[in-house]
């Protein structure tokens, strides 16, 4: 949405911020050194079959990985809206033809975070979401993982209380209704739908509540315990999902309150437990980035208000991303579609590096040494 929401986000971290900072800075990433594998020339390795290219008819078809994930985000329209932009409707209709194992949503499924909305209006928004998005995916038997966005159930605190408690109550009521089962294999759903873990096809997924700029200390302790668990560490890959990104990438979002506070300690926490990718929304701009050992998928908006990338003259674009995962190499391939004409966005057309209010993000296909000297001077 292109409406003014910054004031709702900035005040969210009044409680627990300082203790979370000191707790986070005690975390250091752990590096694992592996001995290089030596191939035995006497062993004949099987020929790997070419990946099967799968996509809706007429679209560029990527080769399918061991696991395929369709990633969407920021679906909503204006405050209180119960309908969705045509690109959202089109995407939901196309998704089954990509044959994904999972759909992930980076948040903002409905258009709340306005105190004047009544309970009936909030319920109507979730009903509209169910009819137009969740139910079609359930009928297609495609599991749906998601993170709560600030417009779904903001955790903003004012005068010691949740400012949007009604939004959070309605979100919880909707998602804990057995009729709205998202089809996930939960590991820990005690905090569902705000923070939870699940697994699928060898990948461990952790969802934290990044509906505001600060993640509470008790939730960070839960994050570390979850990632340190034998279930997480025995998985072939680990992916984390939250609404706000670690670092800014978009015009109009390059301010405190629109990114997670203390991004480097948070990144260190994820790196410590070998999380491969952090998927976020909120900035309404697609950027496939990385920082340190962590890949950062900034998911573009599918609904209202796409935004321009920082350090770029590219036009704002509504997007959908298909991730194909190779579990053996622990690598991912992104195919991101411009939902205006369904063309594929070329990674090399995006900025090499984005420098925002709280740090920089490198495009994930590059190394620091490949940047021009002037871009290394940040």
Regions found by a protein language model. Give the residues of each.
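Secretory targeting signals
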Residues: 1-3
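Short acidic, glycine-rich surface-loop motifs adjacent to enzyme active sites
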Residues: 233-250
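Active-site neighborhood of phospho(di)ester-bond hydrolases with catalytic His/Asp-centered motifs
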Residues: 72-73, 103-107, 144-149, 208, ...
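N-terminal export signals
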Residues: 7-29
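Binuclear metal-dependent phosphoesterase catalytic core
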Residues: 40, 291-377
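Extended active-site neighborhood of metal-dependent phosphoesterases/phosphodiesterases
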Residues: 36-61, 117-236, 262-274, 291-300, ...
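N-terminal active-site segment of His-dependent metallophosphoesterases
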Residues: 29-123
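Solvent-exposed loop/turn segments at secondary-structure junctions
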Residues: 75-78, 109-113, 150-154, 211-214, ...
């Amino acid at each position: 949405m292109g409406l003014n929401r910054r004031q709702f986000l900035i005040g969210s971290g009044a409680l627990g911020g300082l203790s979370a900072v000191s707790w986070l800075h005690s975390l250091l990433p752990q590096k694992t050194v592996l001995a290089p594998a030596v191939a035995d020339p006497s062993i004949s390795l099987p020929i790997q079959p070419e990946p099967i290219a799968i996509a809706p008819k007429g679209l560029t078809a990527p080769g399918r990985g061991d696991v395929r994930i369709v990633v969407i985000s920021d679906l909503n329209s204006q405050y209180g809206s119960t309908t969705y932009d045509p690109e959202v409707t089109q995407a939901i209709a196309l998704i089954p033809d990509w044959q994904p194992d999972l759909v992930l949503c980076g948040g903002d499924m409905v258009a709340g975070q306005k105190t004047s909305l009544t309970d009936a209006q909030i319920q109507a928004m979730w009903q509209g979401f169910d009819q137009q998005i969740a139910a079609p995916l359930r009928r297609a038997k495609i599991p749906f993982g998601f993170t709560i966005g600030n417009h779904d159930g903001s955790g903003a605190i004012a005068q010691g209380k949740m400012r949007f408690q009604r939004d959070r109550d309605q979100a919880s009521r909707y998602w804990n209704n057995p009729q709205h089962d998202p089809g996930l294999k939960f590991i820990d759903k005690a905090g569902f739908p705000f923070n939870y873990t699940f697994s699928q096809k060898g990948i461990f997924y952790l969802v934290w509540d990044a509906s505001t700029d600060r993640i509470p200390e008790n939730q960070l302790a839960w994050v570390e315990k979850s990632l340190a668990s034998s279930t997480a560490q025995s998985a072939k890959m680990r992916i984390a999902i939250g609404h706000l990104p670690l670092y800014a990438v978009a015009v109009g979002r390059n301010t405190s309150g629109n990114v997670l506070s203390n991004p480097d300690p948070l990144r260190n926490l994820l790196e410590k437990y070998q999380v491969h990718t952090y998927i976020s929304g909120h900035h309404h701009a697609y950027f496939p980035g990385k920082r340190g050992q962590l890949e950062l998928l900034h998911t573009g908006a599918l609904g209202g208000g796409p935004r321009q990338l920082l350090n770029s003259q590219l036009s704002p674009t509504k997007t959908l991303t298909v991730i194909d995962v190779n579990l053996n190499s622990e690598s991912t391939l992104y195919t991101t579609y411009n939902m205006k004409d369904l063309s594929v966005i070329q990674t090399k057309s995006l900025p090499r590096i984005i420098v925002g209010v709280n740090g920089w993000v490198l495009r994930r296909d590059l190394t620091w040494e490949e940047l021009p000297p002037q871009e290394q001077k940040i």
